[in-house]
Swiss-Prot record:
CDD domains: RRF. Belongs to the RRF family. It comes from Streptococcus pneumoniae (strain 70585). Its main location: cytoplasm. GO terms for biological process: translational termination. GO terms for cellular component: cytoplasm. Responsible for the release of ribosomes from messenger RNA at the termination of protein biosynthesis. May increase the efficiency of translation by recycling ribosomes from one round of translation to another. This is Ribosome-recycling factor. Keywords: Cytoplasm, Protein biosynthesis. The lineage of its organism: Bacteria, Bacillati, Bacillota, Bacilli, Lactobacillales. It holds the Pfam family RRF. It comes from the Bacteria.
Length: 185
């Protein structure tokens, strides 16, 4: 029963890591990355469709994304969706593909993005701490119901804290790496 609590907490913390990685992928670092377009949805035959489902996204150069629609008739819709997105990148339509040239980041933009990364990282740590609190509460409930002894509770709390510390360290590492990537010129 005690292992189930730890496993559930680990699983939820892993989901937090994956969510953080997705969020970091959407923060542009001055170089082309297909995950920049993950949040772009295109109105395609009346249905909001993720861009990566109706077009291939390639990276021919370090700061260029090439969007090639599977259906050429959707080119205008894709261009409209890219213009409406908050990417800050102007699409160039040449009739068959759309080029997105990622502008070099200014020093001020880099600092702003680094602040955003810290904020997102901090939110992920708060989520992990909430998971820890839930796991601790569950362990205390089991001890109250006499399913585990007081000694087992203490051991379980230590194990939960260790899992939490590992998760927070992983988040700190991810945040530091993303900040370093952003501040590189």
């Amino acid at each position: 029963m005690a292992n189930a609590i730890i496993e559930k907490a680990k699983e939820r913390m892993t989901q937090s890591h994956q969510s953080l990685a997705r969020e970091f992928g959407g923060i542009r670092a001055g170089r082309a990355n297909a995950s920049l377009l993950d949040r772009v949805h295109v109105e395609y035959y009346g249905v909001e469709t993720p861009l990566n489902q109706i077009a291939s996204i390639t990276i021919p150069e370090a700061r260029v994304l090439l969007v090639t629609p599977f259906d050429k008739s959707s080119l205008k819709d894709i261009e409209r969706a890219l213009n409406a997105s908050d990417l800050g990148i102007t699409p160039a339509n040449d009739g068959s593909v759309i080029r997105l040239v990622i502008p070099a980041l200014t020093e001020e933009t880099r600092r702003d993005l680094a602040k955003e990364v810290k904020k997102v990282g901090e939110n992920a740590k708060v989520a992990v701490r909430n998971i820890r609190r839930d796991a601790m509460d569950e362990a205390k409930k089991q001890e109250k119901a006499k399913e585990i002894t007081e000694d087992e509770l203490k051991t379980l709390e230590k194990d939960i804290q260790k899992v939490t510390d590992d998760a927070v360290k992983h988040i700190d590492d991810m945040t530091a790496n993303k900040e370093k990537e952003l501040l590189e010129v």
